[in-house]
Curated annotation (Swiss-Prot):
GO cellular component, one term: cytosolic large ribosomal subunit
Gene3D superfamilies per the UniProt record, alphabetical: 3.10.440.10
Keywords: Ribonucleoprotein, Ribosomal protein
Gene Ontology biological-process entries: cytoplasmic translation
Family: Belongs to the eukaryotic ribosomal protein eL31 family.
GO molecular function annotation: structural constituent of ribosome
InterPro entries, A to Z: Ribosomal_eL31, Ribosomal_eL31_dom_sf
Record's protein name: Large ribosomal subunit protein eL31
Lineage, broadest ranks: Archaea, Thermoproteota, Thermoprotei, Thermoproteales, Thermoproteaceae
Annotated organism of origin: Pyrobaculum arsenaticum (strain DSM 13514 / JCM 11321 / PZ6)
Gene name tied to this protein: rpl31e
Cited Pfam families: Ribosomal_L31e
Lineage: superkingdom: Archaea
Length: 92
């Protein structure tokens, strides 16, 4: 039987993705996903492999193709009881 995962911590961040524009155009959106993973892992003290990116956030990052991700995004981060972290787009 699987145990119910409870939310231990919830935070909101504005992640600046400006550094993604320092990478070549054909790698920017993928690099932006990595930037978010590393940012969240650093701030919540978990490994980056335990960070899960939500579908809505992923679609926003890739919406204007691989060459033009957004400059910054507002995210909601939830740390679960099993140590994984969910990152989703903040509903405005």
């Amino acid at each position: 039987m699987s145990e119910e995962k409870k939310v231990v911590l919830t935070r909101e961040y504005v992640v600046n993705l400006r550094r993604a524009y320092e990478v070549s155009r054909t790698k920017r959106a993928k690099y932006a996903v990595g930037l978010i993973r590393r940012f969240v892992a650093r701030h919540l003290k978990v490994e980056s492999k335990n960070v899960r990116i939500g579908q809505a956030l992923n679609e926003v990052l890739w919406m204007r193709s691989i060459e033009k991700p957004p400059r910054k995004v507002r995210v909601v981060v939830e740390k679960l009881s099993d140590g994984t972290v969910k990152v989703d787009l903040k509903n405005v």
